Amino acid sequence: RDRPTGIWVLRNRGNWADQTSPAKAGNEFNFLNCEGGHIYWWMAHPDRYFKTNPEFFGFSKLTGKREPETLCLTNPELLETAVENLKKRIRAFKEKPDLFTIGFRDSWNMCQCEKCLAPIPLPGGGTLIRKSDDPQEDPLYFSTRYWLFVNQIVERLKQDFPETMFAGSGYFYAAEPPACELDPA
């Protein structure tokens, strides 16, 4: 039952499976154990946090209010909450993942609060100035904002999970290579 799925994954150049995949059962093919993905809600689910901590969520200039579709990547309290929630999720897996992806929802939506649209001081010097409020028109700025957030999370998670590799999502606004180094973990 599992072998055909594993063969199909290999034929399509795949080398991983999550813990729920039929290809993972028995792991005859030595796939990487991968988890994560679209995990913004693992970091701060709107059902739990939106009423009590709306500042965790993205501000929309269009509506003039916080919206639960995305997160405010410059909020330091969100960062700490996200890290603690992700630690709990990773510890809850039967097997610790070989690779954990810190990805966003399939959307161009980004927080448009003053802090998220402010110039970005770059590690190593320099400043990245936003050219547009629209991530499609200024992907370098918004990619850098996202990857700096991912770097902060990875820096904290790798202290507790040194054997786990971490990744992010490189599409939508994050497809543009950022103006910062990525954490090599």
Where in the sequence are the language-model features?
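Feature activates predominantly on carbohydrate-active enzymes
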Residues: R1-L148, E155-P162, A167-G170, A185
